[in-house]
């Protein structure tokens, strides 16, 4: 039970990143740079307290992983801009879970028993249904929908998902480091990635500074993810953390004024239920 409680913290912190950053404002590049600055400050504070042993391998792969993560985050911020937070985030989380699970099964053979394939396939189907309904648009809401650019949003989500899944595979399947040890090199890579996406034209303005708060949310989520994994297992912790998409949907509607028709709200509730059940089943399969 304690592990589940810890897993709820990254669910709320990571789920809040999208609508908090969009409430602050700024371009996706400014949002990413500000977030990475906040993450770097948080990571430096953790390093000064913990003083973990640092190796060359840890630095190299940590920086590489952070750079790859920045691809995912920049794409997600672009998708939010084009599609809205309440649409982009559940699509992002769902596609990460589905693609990550398929890679785990096909490449790393994480499912070995028949029951895992049965329950796992059901979980993936529920996730696909969930993020389909959570992003489904009502024609009656055309006045709002025309303000969005869903084709650009889906393109941004494509490279965002690839970046996030590559990052997850690197740290979960290929290289296994302690979070408290790798968090500083990773934050350095995140900043380098954000600067690269700004074409090395760094401008520290109010949006960059304010978005550093979002980096603190990312850092707090990582710490509690570590605690949750130690108590309940990584699979359960990760699956629960991905339910942050629910927080994004609610936050986008309540705090960003993203309107939904009654029909869309019914679809959203259906999507959330499918998403919760699918993520929990996936965690059970992986554990």
Swiss-Prot record:
One of its GO terms (molecular function) is carbohydrate transmembrane transporter activity. It holds the Pfam family Sugar_transport. It is found in: Cell membrane. GO terms for cellular component: plasma membrane. The keyword Transmembrane applies. Keywords: Cell membrane, Membrane, Sugar transport, Transmembrane, Transmembrane helix, Transport. It is a multi-pass membrane protein. It comes from the Bacteria. InterPro entries: Sugar_transport. Its main location: membrane. The chain crosses the membrane at residues 4-26, 33-50, 55-72, 85-107, 117-134, 154-171, 181-200, 207-229, 234-256, 268-285. Belongs to the GRP transporter (TC 2.A.7.5) family. This is Putative sugar uptake protein M6_Spy1874. It comes from Streptococcus pyogenes serotype M6 (strain ATCC BAA-946 / MGAS10394). The lineage of its organism: Bacteria, Bacillati, Bacillota, Bacilli, Lactobacillales.
């Amino acid at each position: 039970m304690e592990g589940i409680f810890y897993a709820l913290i990254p669910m709320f912190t990571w789920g809040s990143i999208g609508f908090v950053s969009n409430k602050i404002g700024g371009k996706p590049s400014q949002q990413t740079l500000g977030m990475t600055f906040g993450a770097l400050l948080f990571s430096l504070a953790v390093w000064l307290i913990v003083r973990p042993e640092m190796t060359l391998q840890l630095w190299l792969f940590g920086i590489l992983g952070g750079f790859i993560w920045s691809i995912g985050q920049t794409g997600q911020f672009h998708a939010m801009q084009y599609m809205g937070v309440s649409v982009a985030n559940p699509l992002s989380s769902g596609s990460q879970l589905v693609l990550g699970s398929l890679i785990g099964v096909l490449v790393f053979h994480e499912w070995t028993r028949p029951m895992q394939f049965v329950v796992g396939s059901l979980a993936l189907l529920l996730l696909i249904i969930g993020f389909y309904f959570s992003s489904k648009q009502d024609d009656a809401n055309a006045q709002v929908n025309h303000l969005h650019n869903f084709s650009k949003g889906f393109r941004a989500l494509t490279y965002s998902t690839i970046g996030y899944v590559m990052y997850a595979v690197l740290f979960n399947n290929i290289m296994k480091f302690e979070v408290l040890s790798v968090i500083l090199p990773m934050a350095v890579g995140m900043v380098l990635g954000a600067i690269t996406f700004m074409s090395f034209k760094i401008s520290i303005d109010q949006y960059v500074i304010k978005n550093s708060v979002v980096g603190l949310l990312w850092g707090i989520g990582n710490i509690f993810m570590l605690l949750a994994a130690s108590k309940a297992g990584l699979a359960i912790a990760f699956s629960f953390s991905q339910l942050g998409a629910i927080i994004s949907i609610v936050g986008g509607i309540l705090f960003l004024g993203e309107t939904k028709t009654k029909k869309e709200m019914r679809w959203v509730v259906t999507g959330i239920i499918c998403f919760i059940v699918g993520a929990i089943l996936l965690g059970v399969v992986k554990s």
